């Protein structure tokens, strides 16, 4: 880039997954299908939990909030991607890019916090069953959600305001389908040392600490389950936690994959594919993971679908 070639309000170009014009219709149909599946699956989870009184418990309340966050998270990036593919355009303005960065950080932080709360809920249910209703009361759930929301918003605003202080060169190309903070920092012409330090510190704090809490909860859960004398009791206890463990593995596994690919690989396509797994595939799979292995959820979904006139 040429020295002095700066722009106060730059326009970014999202390169997407492929520049091949022949692949664009296929990519459009693929991602439109995935987006609609994500919306439908998560919306069904929310409606099933709200319509069935048997599911009015902390565990299912947190699951419905997780589904709502997944809807919002996917809607932050997918509509713009679909519009760009359909219009065969790649541009996104400065305001739109900052908005994507901010909301992606908010919803990632919220999902992170909800997964920790769900792990704590399972820990209390298995390790302290007699005190479950006392500990996991609505007030505590509300306070924990509020705390998670405040932390996520503050984190997003901090990074967004720091990006506002940067100067960018023109002709900015992002090798992804949405504006990702790590790639935006690489395109800045001004010094990003403080930004990078903040990214590493906040990632360590808001990533490692919650994950450590989840690992601690499941260590205690496994210890308690192993003391159950019957094999049936052990299986039931582990089956309760199985779905959550799969979702946690997907969330943190794909998240670390995005983090490592952005810093360790020279292939922009690999990084873009890792981002697809993180922002598209995981929210789409979450409803399936939580419903297929859960008899109560399947029963509630059947009751909900049976109320739809066309299914009678």
Curated annotation (Swiss-Prot):
Membrane-spanning segments: 26-46, 55-75, 100-120, 140-160, 198-217, 238-258, 272-292
Sorted alphabetically, the Gene Ontology BP terms of this entry are: signal transduction
Which sites carry carbohydrate?
Answer: 5, 93
Got a GO cellular component term for this one? plasma membrane
- List the SUPFAM superfamilies hit by this protein, alphabetically: Family A G protein-coupled receptor-like (SSF81321)
Single GO term (MF):
G protein-coupled receptor activity
Record membrane topology: Multi-pass membrane protein
Cysteines paired by S-S bonds = 97-189
* Residues exposed to the Cytoplasmic side: 47-54, 121-139, 218-237, 293-312
Localization, per the record, is: Cell membrane
| Cell membrane keyword on record | yes
Keywords of the record, alphabetical order, are: Cell membrane, Disulfide bond, G-protein coupled receptor, Glycoprotein, Membrane, Olfaction, Receptor, Sensory transduction, Transducer, Transmembrane, Transmembrane helix
Describe the family membership recorded for this protein in Swiss-Prot or TrEMBL.
Belongs to the G-protein coupled receptor 1 family.
Q: What does this protein do?
A: Odorant receptor.
Protein name, entry field: Olfactory receptor 7G3
The species this protein belongs to is: Homo sapiens
> Its gene?
OR7G3
